[in-house]
Design a protein with these regions (language model features):
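N-terminal Rossmann-like NAD(P) cofactor-binding module of classical short-chain dehydrogenase/reductase
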Residues: 69-72, 95
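Glycine-rich phosphate-binding loop and adjacent beta-alpha segment
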Residues: 22, 33, 77-144
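Local beta-strand N-terminus motif with an aromatic residue
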Residues: 44, 65-69
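Short amphipathic alpha-helix with an adjacent loop that forms part of the alpha/beta core around
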Residues: 53-65
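Mid-domain Rossmann-like dinucleotide-binding core that forms the NAD(H)/NADP(H) cofactor-binding site
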Residues: 1-53
Length: 144
């Protein structure tokens, strides 16, 4: 799995394992029953199927009480960026990883929501700190 290019799914699967190894509670959002089984096997505490769940934000809030501390968007889609901020608790952070073809996508939080909930939106480029990543993955038994 440690190739020069990882697919969106593989990146998400690694993220679930890293987050779990770091003691975080993971809610995975994807589509399909096969993904549910895999995400839970990799360490996700909860799995939400976006093709079946009518109100994802309400479900995330129900599970977390106030919303997620952080949302990492791996999907390269408008919908993922539009819905991500709605999953966050006050002071939460959205991390942009998936890079859509469209260059004009803006995370879907109105400025008032950004200000009142004190949300942060940050970008992340994967592929840096490779040695540290591999070292941590081996130590935490993420990659077996």
């Amino acid at each position: 799995m440690l190739r020069s290019e990882l697919t969106r799914d593989q990146l998400g699967h690694l993220a679930v394992q890293y987050a779990k190894a770091m003691g975080m509670r993971v809610i995975a959002i994807d589509g399909g029953d096969a993904k549910a089984d895999l995400c839970k096997k990799l360490g996700a505490e909860e799995y939400l199927d976006y093709t079946k769940t009518k109100d994802l934000a309400a479900e995330v809030t129900r599970i977390t009480t106030y919303g997620a501390h952080a949302v990492i968007v791996f999907a390269a889609s408008r919908e993922a960026y539009a819905s991500g901020p709605g999953f966050l608790r006050p002071g939460g952070t959205l991390v942009a990883v998936g890079l859509p073809k469209e260059t004009d996508i803006i995370a879907g939080a109105p400025p008032l929501m950004l200000a009142l909930k004190r949300l942060q939106i940050v970008g992340s480029v994967t592929g840096t700190l490779k040695v540290r990543c591999i070292s941590y993955a081996t130590y935490a038994e993420v990659v077996r």
